[in-house]
C-alpha cells in the first residue's frame, strides 16, 4: 500500500491568510483561543494510479508536465492559536453544497458559512477538546455566494471534443409560490450549458 498523501495528491500547496481570532479571542478551557485561516489548497492527482480510477472521466483530464491533473479548492480552518495546546487531531468536514455545518451539528451553534462570533462557537464542544477544524469544497458546479466553499476544476475532454451527455435535474418547490428554477434546480449550482436548443430532445417528468 502507498501513503494516502501519495495516492491522492502530489506537489500540494496551501495559500492561507490569517483572519484574526475566533469570537474575539474567547478562551476554550486549557486549549485557549482559536484563530481563523482562509485560503486555497492547490492539489494534484495522478490519473494513472489505480486508487484514483473511481474518479469519473479522470483519464480524460488535462495533465501537466508532471503527468498529474491540477485542481484547487477553497479551505477554511479554525485551529488553536497555540497549536501545542491542541489535541493534535484534525476534524475534517466536506461541506454539503459548500456549506459549513460542523459547528452547527457538533457544537449546537448558530448556523453560519462565515463562523467568527461567540454564537458560532455554540457550546464549544470541538474547541474545548482541542480539534483543528478544516472545511474544503468537493463540488465543482457551485456558484460563489453566501460564503460557500468552491473549487477550480479542469474540464475533461475526448481529445479536443467536449464530453456531452444527458443531465438529470430535480426541481423541488420548497416554499409556496415558487414558480421558477434555474436549469440546475438549485440557485447555488451552476447549470450545464446545453448542446441543443431543440426542446423535443428534453424530457420533463
Feature roles, as predicted:
Residues 9-205:
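C-terminal His-loop and adjacent cap/lid subdomain of alpha/beta-hydrolase
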Amino acid at each position: 500500500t502507498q501513503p494516502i498523501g501519495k495516492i491522492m495528491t502530489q506537489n500540494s500547496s496551501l495559500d492561507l491568510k490569517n483572519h484574526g481570532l475566533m469570537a474575539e479571542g474567547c478562551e476554550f478551557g486549557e486549549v485557549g483561543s482559536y484563530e481563523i485561516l482562509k485560503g486555497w489548497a492547490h492539489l494534484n492527482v495522478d490519473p494513472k494510479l489505480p486508487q484514483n480510477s473511481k474518479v469519473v472521466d479522470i483519464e480524460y483530464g488535462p495533465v501537466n508536465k508532471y503527468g498529474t491533473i491540477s485542481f484547487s479548492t477553497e479551505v477554511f480552518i479554525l485551529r488553536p492559536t497555540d497549536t501545542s495546546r491542541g489535541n493534535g487531531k484534525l476534524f475534517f468536514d466536506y461541506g454539503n453544497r459548500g456549506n459549513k455545518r460542523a459547528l452547527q451539528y457538533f457544537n449546537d451553534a448558530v448556523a453560519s458559512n462565515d463562523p467568527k462570533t461567540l454564537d458560532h462557537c455554540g457550546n464549544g464542544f470541538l474547541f474545548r477538546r482541542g480539534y483543528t477544524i478544516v472545511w474544503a469544497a468537493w463540488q465543482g458546479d457551485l456558484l460563489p455566494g453566501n460564503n460557500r466553499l468552491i473549487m477550480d476544476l479542469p474540464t475533461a475532454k475526448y481529445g479536443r471534443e467536449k464530453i456531452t451527455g444527458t443531465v438529470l435535474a430535480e426541481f423541488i418547490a420548497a416554499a409556496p409560490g415558487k414558480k421558477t428554477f434555474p436549469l440546475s434546480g438549485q440557485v447555488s449550482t451552476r447549470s450545464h450549458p446545453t448542446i441543443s436548443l431543440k426542446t423535443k430532445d428534453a424530457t420533463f417528468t
